[in-house]
Swiss-Prot record:
Belongs to the AIR synthase family. The gene is purM. It catalyses: 2-formamido-N(1)-(5-O-phospho-beta-D-ribosyl)acetamidine + ATP = 5-amino-1-(5-phospho-beta-D-ribosyl)imidazole + ADP + phosphate + H(+). Its main location: cytoplasm. Pfam families: AIRS, AIRS_C. The keyword Ligase applies. It comes from Escherichia coli (strain K12). One of its GO terms (molecular function) is phosphoribosylamine-glycine ligase activity. Its EC number is 6.3.3.1. Pathway: Purine metabolism; IMP biosynthesis via de novo pathway; 5-amino-1-(5-phospho-D-ribosyl)imidazole from N(2)-formyl-N(1)-(5-phospho-D-ribosyl)glycinamide: step 2/2. GO terms for cellular component: cytosol. This is Phosphoribosylformylglycinamidine cyclo-ligase. It is found in: Cytoplasm. It comes from the Bacteria.
Length: 345
């Protein structure tokens, strides 16, 4: 009888011990995100979460997202500590625009070969994003899949569930002629447009780690984590009559603002009301990007736009700026039957 080598899962490229080491490393940071509604801890087959008792007619709101090719840039620059914040931000910001309070978050981390240090940095960032948004990181999936990804490359996806009172859902139906638009400043490109960012870096021959912009490396501007607006916006909703909120993600101004506008309304944006952060000027110049394309691809310094009645503007601005936001009046809503839903002038 011919002796055969005994094969193990590790021989096939899957290191269960590394996975267990990762769980042990992240338990502490995950525990810090726990909300009182969460039942049980990490390791169960499913996560249990009760609804907060303050809701009379609770409606669940769900969302899922990734961080696009910003992840490729983070891997190339070996900076993994904030990409998890981006992941949470892309999900929870989508929930809060409908008035929802994020409850819990789950992540999916897939890689060809699990590096415990890298995965721990990413998941610690996810936990930080959950802390910033007040939701619990209740579980996730770490998939080591040799042959599916090159080396230690990885991909991430996030899933979030929130809750809103049925009578307080924000859906844009109250938007009307004369409403004022308030902008919330962004921290940079957030997590959109990075295929164009990477193309601009390639064509320009620029090294983002040695190129300086506003006194710090360009890489710091490009990898600045997506701003999480949840706590500021939830407080605003409690105290001000908010008609609509648009999260400026893929598609920029042209595609995201119309998503919350009723028929026969038009958003008129005053371009003179703010200056683009320098990173957007650099991208436009280095890539020779047309103005219209900038507004279609990037947020150009505006992370969210909020529509509300004119008498509420001063109160809203005071609240938002007191909570650390950079908020300003950026435009108005006009009655219009034009097919052009957004005008920038």
């Amino acid at each position: 009888m011919t002796d055969k080598t005994s094969l193990s899962y590790k021989d096939a490229g899957v290191d269960i011990d590394a996975g267990n080491a990762l769980v042990g490393r992240i338990k502490g940071v995950v525990k810090k995100t726990r909300r009182p509604e969460v039942m049980g801890g990490l390791g169960g087959f499913g996560a249990l979460c009760a609804l907060p008792q303050k809701y009379r007619e609770p409606v669940l709101v769900s969302g899922t997202d990734g961080v696009g090719t910003k992840l490729r840039l983070a891997m190339d620059l070996k900076r993994h500590d904030t990409i998890g914040i981006d992941l949470v931000a892309m999900c929870v910001n989508d929930l809060v625009v409908q008035g929802a309070e994020p409850l819990f978050f789950l992540d999916y981390y897939a890689t060809g070969k699990l590096d415990v240090d890298t995965a721990s940095a990413v998941i610690s960032g996810i936990a930080e994003g959950c802390l910033q948004s007040g939701c619990s990181l209740v579980g996730g999936e770490t998939a080591e899949m040799p042959g599916m990804y090159h080396g230690e490359d990885y991909d991430v996806a996030g899933f979030c569930v929130g809750v809103v009172e049925k009578s307080e859902i924000i859906d844009g139906s109250k938007v009307s002629d004369g409403d004022v638009l308030i902008a919330l400043g962004s921290s940079g490109p957030h997590s959109n447009g990075y295929s164009l960012v990477r193309k601009i870096l390639e064509v320009s021959g620029c090294d983002p780690q040695t190129t300086e912009l506003d006194g710090k490396p360009l890489a710091d501007h490009l990898l600045a984590p997506t701003r999480i607006y949840v706590k500021s916006v939830l407080e605003l909703i409690e105290k001000v009559d908010v008609h609509a909120i648009a999260h400026l993600t893929g598609g920029g101004f042209w595609e995201n603002i119309p998503r919350v506008l009723p028929d026969n309304t038009q958003a008129v944006i005053d371009e003179s009301s703010w200056q683009w952060p320098e990173v957007f000027n650099w991208l436009q110049t280095a890539g020779n990007v047309e103005h219209h394309e900038m507004y279609r691809t990037f947020n150009c310094g505006v992370g969210m736009i909020i529509a509300l009645p004119a008498p509420e503007v001063d109160k809203a601005l005071a609240l938002l700026n007191a909570n650390g936001e950079n908020a300003w009046k950026i435009g108005i809503i006009k009655a219009s039957d034009s097919e052009q839903r957004v005008v920038i002038e």
